[in-house]
Amino acid sequence: MTHHLTDNYLANLSIATSLLSLCQLVQPEWLNEFIRLGTTPLNSSSGETSLEAHFDFLSISKFRPTFSPSLPESQKHFNKWEPNEERVNLFRKFRFICMTEKIREMDGELRDAIHRGGGTLENFDIHSDISKFHQALTRSRAKEGKSVVVIGDIDAIQTAVGSAAWEALLAEAKRLVPFFNLS
C-alpha cells in the first residue's frame, strides 16, 4: 500500500497503521485524478499528459487531508503526517499481550498496527485464571528480550469478569510489568 485515502488527518488505528507502513495520506480526490489521468488518451486534444505516456505520481501537496478539529495543536503540522523512516518497526522492541474476552475478538486493526510496527502479539483470554495470566506475563517477559505491553479495554474487561477479577488481573500485571494507564 502506498497511499491512504482520507478526508481528515485523524488520530486513529487505521491512519496509525498507514503511517507505520510509510503511506502517504491523501484526499480521495487524489485517486479520482489519478484514475482520470490514467484514462486520458495518449494523444489528448486537451493537451493533458496521459499517465501511460509519462508516469508520475500526482503532487501530494494538492491533495492533503484537512486537520480534524479533534487533533491537538501539536499534531496540526503536515510533517507529523508524512512518511517517516523512524516509524518503521516502531514496536520491534515490544511484545503486546492483548486481554480479550475471546481470543478471536482481537481487534483486527490493532493486530495489523502492531504487526506493521514490527511488534509481536499474544492474546490472553480474560476468563482464564490468574495463574495462567502470571504464566503469560512471565513467558512474554522472557521471550526475545522485548518489553511487555499489556493492553485491553478496561470497561469491557470489568463487564465481562467483574470488578474483583479485574482488580486481580490488574494487580498481577502491575507486579510484573511497568504500569502506564493511557485511557
What do the PLM-derived regions correspond to, one by one?
Residues 1-64, 102-183:
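BRCT (BRCA1 C-terminal) domain core and associated BRCT-interaction motifs
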Residues 44-92:
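A conserved helix-loop-strand patch within extracytoplasmic ligand-binding domains
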